[in-house]
Amino acid sequence: MEPITIPTDRDGVAYLYGHPLRNSLSPPLHQTVYNALGLNWTQIPLSTATGTSFTRSPEISTFLSSVRSNPKFVGSSVTMPWKVAIMPHLDDLTEDARQAGACNTIYLRKEDDGKTQYVGTNTDCIGIREALLQGSPNGAEHFKGKPALIVGGGGTARTAIYVLRKWLGVSKIYIVNRDAKEVEAILAEDKQRNPSPQVALVPVSDPSAAATLEAPVAVVSGIPNYPPQTEEEIRARETLRVFLNRQTHEKDQGVILEMCYHPLPWTDIAQIAQDARWKVILGSEALIWQGLEQARLWTGKDVVSEPGLVEKVQAFVAQTIAERSKSNL
């Protein structure tokens, strides 16, 4: 376990809390923002990774005790394995964190009585939302009243469901996943959080069923880039393929957000979608927008409106991913 560093040469410090932290873009992304804003801040990862070994990040009690007594602390990114476990230990949670079922960001909120609240939120919601809105041909209108599709059964799927419902106004959400139990868990959790949802979740596990349903206009894929091997994986991939190929007969071009961008930004699913004439949005776009939302919460500045800042962050991320793709890190 790495000690929690408080840098003496910086005015503010954010942390990246989790493990293993291999090739994370978060610290350099935030440094790009801080430099552009003229802030003497930094973000420090709380674990290290080399080869196949890594150091563990501190336990939650140790971490929170340290940051609560750190006058330079401005906020923290939170990643696995702490995104769910940390939630009950914080002073408050935003609706985004509660509905997504995970916290990826801690920020400070001053109360009227002068006390500081340590608040958990989920900026992945903003990342997915902005990636879809910025990448769609006509903004939110592209999605309203039309079906969307989620690929996967993990945290990304849960977050995407919330985003599609809250901000994009879709009519229904199909779920395609290899593991039926994961889908059942999503449905059970959703029923508990939203007893009377306006937008239904529709599991689809068979290509023939996909062929009879209204074609989606948006897809969020949140699975690793591995070739399907098992019968369930092959069926799920073929179900997705049927959905994607149907959109060529629709008036509007579909958009797909491929959240997997490591180790390579272009995945098998991205290629299938492009071949079916979908517009592919790389997952790095969601990374950028969620990072900018973190920076807004930590700095208190409207970072997106800062001239040239978004472009600097986009250029940095694009260059870094391109370099890593060449070396296949």
From Swiss-Prot:
Q: Which residues form the signal peptide?
A: none
Q: Which GO terms describe its biological process?
A: 3,4-dihydroxybenzoate biosynthetic process; chorismate biosynthetic process; quinate catabolic process; shikimate metabolic process
Determine if Disulfide bond is one of this entry's keywords.
Answer: no
Pathway as given in its UniProt record? Aromatic compound metabolism; 3,4-dihydroxybenzoate biosynthesis; 3-dehydroquinate from D-quinate (NAD(+) route): step 1/1
InterPro entries the UniProt entry points to: Aminoacid_DH-like_N_sf, NAD(P)-bd_dom_sf, Shikimate_DH-bd_N, Shikimate_DH_fam
Pfam families for this protein? Shikimate_dh_N
What Enzyme Commission number(s) appear in the record? 1.1.1.24
What reactions does this protein catalyze?
L-quinate + NAD(+) = 3-dehydroquinate + NADH + H(+)
Query: Does the record bear Disulfide bond in its keywords?
Result: no
Q: What keywords is this UniProt entry annotated with?
A: NAD, Oxidoreductase, Quinate metabolism
Q: Which GO terms describe its molecular function?
A: quinate 3-dehydrogenase (NAD+) activity; shikimate 3-dehydrogenase (NADP+) activity
Q: Know the name of this protein?
A: Quinate dehydrogenase
Q: Which organism is it from?
A: Emericella nidulans (strain FGSC A4 / ATCC 38163 / CBS 112.46 / NRRL 194 / M139)
